Amino acid sequence: MNGQNIRIRLKAFDHRILDTSTKEIVSTAKRTGAQVRGPIPLPTKIEKFTVNRSPHVDKKSREQFEIRTHKRVLDIVDPTPQTVDALMKLDLAAGVDVEIKL
């Protein structure tokens, strides 16, 4: 697999779970002999929702909720077949979304 890179994008609502997952991926890749670039933190996406507190009166009384989506990018340079097998068998936390591009 010479000259090929694996790009892994991770997304999660909780940054602590995201950081532990990136540490697991980095340690697994380094253990199998691959070179890792990252983790690179991407900008956090913040979605805000504003709703009325009461159903029909007091328009000025509102409440805001937000969802923060934290993101990280990892590049694995020149992965070995053992690296790919180890990454496929890796079990990450339930709240982490993983996108892998070859």
UniProtKB/Swiss-Prot annotation:
Known SMART domains for this protein? Ribosomal_S10 (SM01403)
Whether Ribosomal protein counts among this entry's keywords is yes
UniProt-listed PROSITE patterns: RIBOSOMAL_S10 (PS00361)
Its Gene Ontology molecular function terms? Answer: structural constituent of ribosome; tRNA binding
One family from Pfam that matches here is Ribosomal_S10
User: What interactions and quaternary structure are annotated?
Assistant: Part of the 30S ribosomal subunit.
Write down what this protein is called: Small ribosomal subunit protein uS10
Native species of this protein?
Answer: Beijerinckia indica subsp. indica (strain ATCC 9039 / DSM 1715 / NCIMB 8712)
Query: What lineage does UniProt assign to this protein's organism?
Result: Bacteria, Pseudomonadati, Pseudomonadota, Alphaproteobacteria, Hyphomicrobiales
Query: What gene is behind this protein?
Result: rpsJ
